[in-house]
Swiss-Prot record:
Coiled coil: none annotated. One of its GO terms (biological process) is protein transport to vacuole involved in ubiquitin-dependent protein catabolic process via the multivesicular body sorting pathway. SMART domains: UBA (SM00165). It is found in: Cytoplasm. Residues 1-78 form the Ubiquitin-like domain. This is DNA damage-inducible protein 1. Binds ubiquitin and polyubiquitinated proteins.
Length: 448
């Protein structure tokens, strides 16, 4: 038969299918398993009458299908024991809270980033870090305020008064807009509070990735930026490393990212050593006068099959060279620290574009034929460089018309040499035009 058991202490209801021949003693044992109440503490009532007689079957006690049995507690000793258990549980909970608060205090003391964040967000609590008892009292006080509703998302009396006035005239569009704005701000504050609790590290600054690199034997610190299209070096650092004489001024142009900066040229190949490795690998640089002396961009990361292993905090180059990313304290001049001015055109930019009818750094597609640019050939006159470049459509049309004539300027062997690298004849001729007939420079342009 089916019986419904209702626990009067917590209003819990349980429906069970049991046999009519089950004794009351077995029924009480079943209830103990379901409700965790011992048979001695059980008070069972059916139709307002207590059930008694542990050896009697439920059928003999008058229980029928779909009857209701009320379960209550009658033992005073049980109540006392329960109270004692409650006190013990509260004591254990208190000890657990104390342990968590002390662990949090220790974490704040051992983690400089969290310590700095606490100093900015809650100076009063930060001042108690070195005093465990004061810190505990402050945290408990904050928790009590939070439980009482004094959360960042709750309304202060002034806001509550304003909300009441707005609700007095709910049909006014301005009032509705203001109420929606207050609700939206409350949700934002709640979301921010949630982020504080589950991901406090998101409110601290993230260290940028720097590595040690030897350029022409000179040890420098390079900023690793997988979002930058090209590897960049400043003229000052190029001079310091003794490679400024290798700057090819024919690659003058403009780098466009968040802003724009002048490209002073390109260094085609310089041996560099990553970290403490003695293995040298070739590296090319775009020369830009920027606040980042050396930026290790995506072109070299791809070329040397680099892996940014953030779990181990290392840069893996070519599968066999590893170097640790520098700690913030090891970075000699960090331009990304607050208050350090710098250009926005280098780090994180999309690379540069060369001029005239030129091509974009990092691409060899046909669409580059339409890119407006400002390459200044070495033998150009000042008047020539001041002429305005035609628009993209005109450039493309002129180039298509002059392709046949341009091919006669260059030897067929030079064109075939570039075509054998996987490029079309038009791209090969176009690159030769930009490099003034220099096959090596043209190949470098096509591979960018």
């Amino acid at each position: 038969m089916r019986l419904t058991i209702s626990n009067e202490s917590n209003n819990q209801i349980l429906s069970v299918d049991i046999s009519e021949s089950m004794t009351l003693e077995d029924f009480q044992a079943y209830i103990q398993a379901e409700f965790d109440i011992s048979p001695q503490d059980q008070s069972l009532k059916h139709n307002g009458k207590p059930l008694s007689g542990s050896d009697k079957s439920l059928e003999d006690l008058g229980l029928n299908n779909d009857d209701l049995v009320l379960l209550g507690k009658t033992s005073v000793g049980s109540t006392t024991a329960s109270s004692g258990s409650s006190v013990t549980a509260n004591s254990n909970n208190s000890n657990a809270v104390d342990f968590q608060i002390e662990a949090m205090r220790t974490q704040f003391l051992s983690n400089p980033q969290l310590n700095s964040q606490l100093r900015q967000s809650n100076p009063q609590l930060h001042s108690t870090l070195n005093n465990p008892s004061e810190f505990k009292n402050s945290v408990i006080g904050s928790l009590q305020q939070f439980q009482n509703g004094a959360t960042p998302g709750s309304y202060n009396p002034q806001q509550q008064e304003q909300l009441s006035r707005l609700q007095d005239n709910p049909d006014d569009p301005e009032s509705q807009s203001r109420i929606l704005e207050m609700i939206r701000q409350e949700r934002i504050d709640e979301n921010m509070q949630l982020a504080y609790e589950i991901a406090p590290e998101s409110f601290t600054s993230v260290n940028m990735l720097y590595i040690n690199i030897k350029v022409n034997g000179v040890l420098v610190q390079a900023f690793v930026d997988s979002g930058a299209q090209s590897t960049i070096i400043s003229p000052k650092l190029a001079d310091k490393c003794g490679i400024s004489r290798l700057i090819d001024r024919r690659f003058v142009g403009e780098a466009r990212g968040v802003g724009s900066q002048k490209i002073e040229g390109k260094i085609h190949s310089v041996p560099i050593a990553i970290g403490d490795s003695d293995t040298h690998i070739p590296c090319s640089f775009i020369v830009i006068d920027t606040h980042v002396d050396l930026l290790f961009g995506l072109d070299m990361l791809r070329r040397h099959k680099c892996v940014l292993d953030l779990e181990r905090d290392v840069l893996v180059v070519g599968g066999n060279i590893e170097t640790k990313f520098l700690h913030e304290s090891e970075i000699q001049a960090n331009p990304f620290l607050p208050g350090v001015a710098g250009s926005s055109a280098s780090a994180g930019g999309t690379g540069g574009t060369f001029g005239g009818q030129g091509i974009a750094l990092g691409s060899n597609s046909a669409e580059n034929n339409n890119v407006t640019s400002s390459i200044v050939p070495a033998n150009s006159t000042p008047d020539t460089t001041k002429q305005k470049a035609p628009n993209a459509a005109a450039n493309a049309a002129v180039k298509r018309q002059d392709t046949g004539n341009s091919s006669s300027k260059f030897s067929e062997s030079d064109i075939k040499q570039l075509v054998s690298l996987g490029f079309s004849k038009q791209e090969a001729i176009f690159a030769l035009e930009q490099s003034q007939g220099n096959v090596e420079v043209a190949a470098s342009l096509l591979f960018q």
